[in-house]
């Protein structure tokens, strides 16, 4: 996990000086430029094109094979297993956000699902009325008032921003699995953790594949669409964590989270 984060960060930082788009002089174009918050757009579009090729030649064939040899219940179990593994990260961020009631709920979920749910394969806690929620250090930074910073497109990892990139590193530090690799045989644990990373990424991608296909077919500019949806989703997630209201006066929701489609698995 550490290698994945630092590799992406190194690539981004190494090309920042040459990758920035020039600021438009036209007032209307400048307003659009500032709203998109994407000064690295030329570079980001190149990385996005690379990600699409990786999707076409690697992720999509592997995902379709994974879908062909597994059942919807199996795939859902994989997703809930990994969601349960990341619960300690959510608990830490709830505490940092001073949201102690939610931290207590997540601890209850983790205990119930790790025992009665067979290590999180089954979401027993949700059936008992303890709904899941996910927090990240990117959310915590947003609650603390940190702006998102420029939009970033990371190789293979997809859309992000400066705040979430920093948050990714902190979440890795909060993750107990990170220390399992340090305290045990490093080579063996590294192999196990990389395998788990791959399986988790595959499970999440498979669950969102149909949604992504629809978005690609129905958008005139798939990159701009991806950027817009990511930024809206992240604003909603931070507002949700902070308990703020959106422009309609309603509580912000995870409208754009791919996790909302967990129960829409396909054969």
Each predicted region: which residue ranges?
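A structured, mid-to-C-terminal "fold-capping" secondary-structure block
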Residues: 22-34, 145-267
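Post-signal peptide N-terminal segment of mature Sec-exported envelope proteins
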Residues: 28-57, 87
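A small/polar active-site loop signature that marks catalytic segments
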Residues: 76
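C-terminal motif of bacterial Sec signal peptides marking the signal peptidase cleavage site
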Residues: 16-19
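Beta-rich strand-turn-strand
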Residues: 79-81
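Bacterial N-terminal signal peptides that target proteins for export
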Residues: 1-9
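Mid-length scaffold segments of soluble, non-membrane domains
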Residues: 84-162
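Membrane interface segments of multi-pass transport proteins and intramembrane proteases
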Residues: 57, 64-73
